[in-house]
Structure formats: C-alpha cells, structure tokens
Amino acid sequence: MRKKKRKKHTKTITKIVLFSGILIGGGIGIVTIMNRNVPEKRLMEYMKYIEKGEYEQMYAMLDQKKSSMNSKEEFIERNSKIYEGIEMSDLSITDITAKRKENGNAAVSYTTNMQTAAGNVEFTNNAVFSHNWTGYHLIWQDQLIFPELSATDKVQVTLEEAKRGNILDRNGRQLAGEGTASSVGIVPGRMENREDTIKKLAEYLGIGADEIEDKLKADWVKADSFVPVATIPKIQEVDLLTVNPDETVLEEKEKQDTLLKIPGIMLSDVKVRTYYLKEAASHLVGYVQAVTAEDLQEHKGEGYRTNSVIGKTGLETLYEKELKGTDGCEICIVDANGNKKSVIAYEPRKDGEDIHITIDGDLQSTLYEQFKEDRGCSVALNPYTGEVLALVSTPSYDNNDFVRGMDNSQWSALNENEDRPLYNRFRQTWCPGSTFKPVIAAIGLKVGAFTANDDFGNEGLAWQKDSSWGDYTVTTLHDYEPVILKNALIYSDNIYFAKAALKIGADQLMQSLNQIGFNQELPFDIKMSESQYSNMDKIETEIQLADSGYGQGQILVNPLHLASIYTAFLNDGNMIKPYLHADGGSTSSEIWIKDAFSPQIVSEVMEGLEGVVNNPEGTGYGACREDIRLAGKTGTAELKATKEDTSGTEIGWFTVFTTDRDTKNPILLISMVENVKDIGGSGYVVEKDKAILDEYLGNE
C-alpha cells in the first residue's frame, strides 16, 4: 500500500512540474507575441541584432515585399559591409517615440548612439513598420543605416595611419624610427621565363617557390602589377662609399644587382620600422611585428587593425601605449560617382609619442663591439643620478630581421645557436664571484661582526673551519700580510671573506641582503630577475654560508641590481634607483634604499676598492689611469658540480667606476663574460673594459 501511494505521489509531482513548464514556455511565447505588437520593442529587437551582427535575424524581421532590398543576400551584404567596415560597436537607441497610423502601420522616431572607427556617432532617425495579424514588420530602407544614405550611395571609410613614435637616446640619436627598406617583387607581365624567374628569386630569398606562386595568383594581380614577395635591407650608397665597406653589404649589393638583371624582378622602396644600432641594442630596444589574431583579441577596442604592428619585445613593448598613436579616420557617404555627400564622423590622426631614454648610443655600440664574440652582458650607469647608460647582451641578433621577416634558415640559425643570441643576459641573475666581496664587507662592518683593521690571520692558500667540513676547503691565490679588509679586497682573498660570512652568521646575512633588495623586484622599467642568496628559503649549511662570503654558494645577482648596490659606495651609503625613461630631461637622482651603509663604512670599503685598481698588486690594476681615479672589483665565479670538478666553467666579472663626482662623464660599469677559464679569467674582462673606458672617458 505504501509503495502504491508513493508512486501515485510521484506521478502527481511530475504532472505539476510538466504543467508548470508548459505555463512558463507559454509565458515566453506570449511575451514574444506581445513584443511583435509593440513597434518600439520590435525596433529595439532589430537594433540588438545589429549589435550582435546577426544579419539573418534582422532580415527575418522585415516586411520583405515593401522593403527596398531585392534579396536576402543583398541585404546581408549591404548591412554587414557597412557596419563591419565602420567597426560599429556599443550600439544603443534612446528617445523612442511611436506613432500609429490609421492603416495599422507605425512610425518610430529614435536617437542612435554607436562607437565607430572614427569615434562616437549620434543621430536621430525614423523607422516605419507595417502591421498584419502576425505583428509589426520593419519596412527597410537604406536610410535606416544612416539618414542621409540612399540606395545608390556608399559608406566610405578612410584611414590615416598614425606614425609610431621614435625611441631616442640621451643625445637625441634615433634608436628606433621610420626607415627605408627594399621590397623585392615581380611584375608578371615582364617575366620572360616564369618558372626560372620564380626559382631564382626563391633561392635568393630562401623561401619556397610555391610561396611566390601563391602571391602571384592573388585576385588583384594583373600583368603590370608589382607583386611584393619579401622585404630586404636597402643598400645605401653611403655604405658603399666608406673606406672599408662591410663585406656583407658588398655581397648583398652583388646579389641584388644579379637579381635586377632578371626580367620581371624589381625593387621598390618601402617605409619600415628601423633599428639603427642593430645587434648592439636589440635585446634592449626589441622589435615590432604585425599583429596576430590573438593580439587583436587581447587588445580589442584599443585601435589595432589587421595591418597594425605591435611591440613584441624590449622597449617596443614596454612603451607600446605611448609609441603606438591613434590612426585618423573619416567615415563619409559618397554618391554613385564617388562624390562626398556628407561626413558621418571624423577622428584626426594622433601620432605616437617619442620616447627619450637615458642610454648613450655610442657607449652601447662600443660595449657591443668589444664583447660581441663573447657570451656576456654589460650594464653602465651614472652612479650619482641612476641614469642607465648602457644595457648590452652578447651575442646578439639584428632586430631589423624580425621586422622585414626571416626565412626558415635564418630563424633556425638563431634559435638553434648554442651561444643563444636571443637570450637576454642582462635581465638574468648570475653567480657574482668576488664582485660580491665588497657587499659582504659592508654588511659585516654594519652589523659589527668585525672592523676594517681586524687581522683575520694568514691561513696560507687553503683553509677550513674545522674537521666537520671533511675534505672541503676554501682556497685563495695570494699570500699576504696583514690580513685586513683593505688587503683582502686588493688581493681578492676568498678565505678572508669566507671567515667574514661566518662571523656575520646566516640569519644576519640573509636579513641584511633582504634589506638591500634581495628576493624582491628591482624598481626598474624593464623587469629583471630577482637576486637570491639561496635556491631554497635560506642559507642552510655552514659551508654554503662560507661560500656565500666570496660570491659563490647559491648567490645569484642581477648585474643592474649589483650596480645599484655599488652606487652606495659613492653616495654616502645610499643606494640609487636606476632609471631608463628620461622624463622631461631631468637628471636628478632618486634614492632606492636610504642608509644601506654608513658613510664611515663606505670610506673603509672604498679604500680597498681603490686599491684594487690603483695598487700594482690589485687584480684590476690593468684598468688604472693617470688622469681619472677609478675604483672597482674583479670577480671570477666558478661553475662546477663539486670542488674537485675540473670540467666546470668560469664567469669573469669586472665592476669599475669613476670616484670623483666632478668627473665630466661619471660612470659605473659592470661587465660579465661566460667561459673565461682559458682566456685569462677576469683579466680578460678588465682588458675589454679598459678599452671601453679609454674611449668613453677620453682625456679629461
């Protein structure tokens, strides 16, 4: 009995639910029918379909006998071309008023508001609806799109491309701007042997012949058309008139001359984004490329079109909003003869802003030329103002190739190169080796772990704290007396700084390093990797702590961060914030970390740093000058699996800076080179930096 009752109850519920569904569904139908009998709501429904681009739904609402369009296809083509051509969005109507006529028809007046490629458009308009037993149906006329539009008129959209802003160095020299390249292409009607012409051009460009064939088959191509195939560097006459023309330029010129002898092949000048320092600044400046479908989706509503370019790397993407500009646009109605009848909307062109940066283009180029065959990086800044003068990564690539387009072989050569020319080294962190010793010295003095005159004792060339270290020892290269801070810096004594780190202690060292920017983002325009003192959260062992004292262990430092720390030695212990964007030409400094060290500590550390360069026993003596006082620190970081590993590599460092605030061109320069083990260690870097400083400082 219970089962039967339960079953009956279930049936009752089911019936109720089904009946409710019928009521709800019927309710929706009733609402739809009611809307069909309200012309104002029918108009709003039609406008929603316009907003969504649902042209078939729009057509379904028409009184097809009375509307001016002959067919559904014509209607869809007319509406879609206009609305999509003007880039209509955010369409809405207000002030809707309907007047019903005696014959049942209705006239609805309203105000349209929409966004277009030329900005906001607003106008009043009228729509007429016919009426029958199924409700109101729109009598479509062309004026429903725009009041002035007749059936024979066209809506014309004219774009005026905004000029992308230039990127300029501190002296106004162009790093990125508009330049000229050569477009190589074919005039089909002038070819004598089509197959041979295409084959030779494909070989020269490093592309497939089928790719050229596809371009020649385009609908717009006629016998006398110039069909662009690729963009290549333009050979300037001035490049050929130099005393010793570049071999690659001569080879390229010879190839182009050979190509031009083939009937049907032509070169034409085209304007392209050009990077004037090429490889010397490619990692810094970056490059632009044509927008992708993903770019258009991500930056919807920001004025990008299918023919736009967008910054992909470097400063080009960092300052994209400022550099981009806004294209000009005019939307107008023209008659059948092409005469302008009226202007619907006009947005003037707004060119992109020029970006002035603190980089010295000449110094950037000089650094690149010195190190272009090495794996390394250099950063240079004014230590008093924080103006970044150079950011160089080597080996490098020509960023112009990304604008002009690369063939598969060019891309493979870059991407598969074991020296990784695409890798931006100045943004990374590296084992600093002995360049870290002044930092340990300053921290030790600050926390009172030792004084500058404390003699740590001569341990010879190898040392370990006690037998708990097993076979592990810290080694150094020079034996000297007394073992005090100044001498330890001059002779770059690993043992002294291993002891210094132990005296400071792991907790105090980690806390002190955090206070000078470790494990935090460098406040700089370009995002840099964060410096660290451990792969984990902390320094875990005594040996790791000792190794950290001379810049080994798990210490990794970003070169620009290291440069900022060194600015404290020239600014009474204040770390200066580096900057790149020369806003308004101001050169005033901004302190990043105030009182990182005291003036007394700075004085004691500086005594050793000056000795490194000016004392004949100093490891940086090779950079010593008679006219300008320099200070600095060398470093050789060992990268190997174990202490006994003989197959590891070495990173060579040299940090060098002018010490007199009144120097005409003050500079703090840090250079790092990988794999210096067999080419002189840090001495190799000292020699290179000396040549750079000789050119930059000249004879003051």
Language model features by range: what are they?
Residues M1-I13:
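N-terminal Lys/Arg-rich, disordered targeting/topogenic segments
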Residues K15-G29:
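Hydrophobic membrane-insertion alpha-helices, especially the h-region
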Residues G27-M44:
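Sec-dependent signal peptide cleavage junction
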Residues M34, K41, E56-A107:
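Short solvent-exposed beta->alpha transition segments
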Residues Y46, I50-M58:
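Short helix-adjacent coil turns
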Residues K81-C377, Y397-P421, T429:
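Extracytoplasmic/periplasmic proteins that interact with beta-lactams or build/remodel peptidoglycan
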Residues V334-I344, Y384-S434, V439-S671, G681:
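Beta-lactam-recognizing serine transpeptidase/beta-lactamase-like catalytic domain environment
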Residues S588-E590, V686-E700:
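Short, gly/Ser/Thr-rich active-site loops of penicillin-recognizing serine hydrolases
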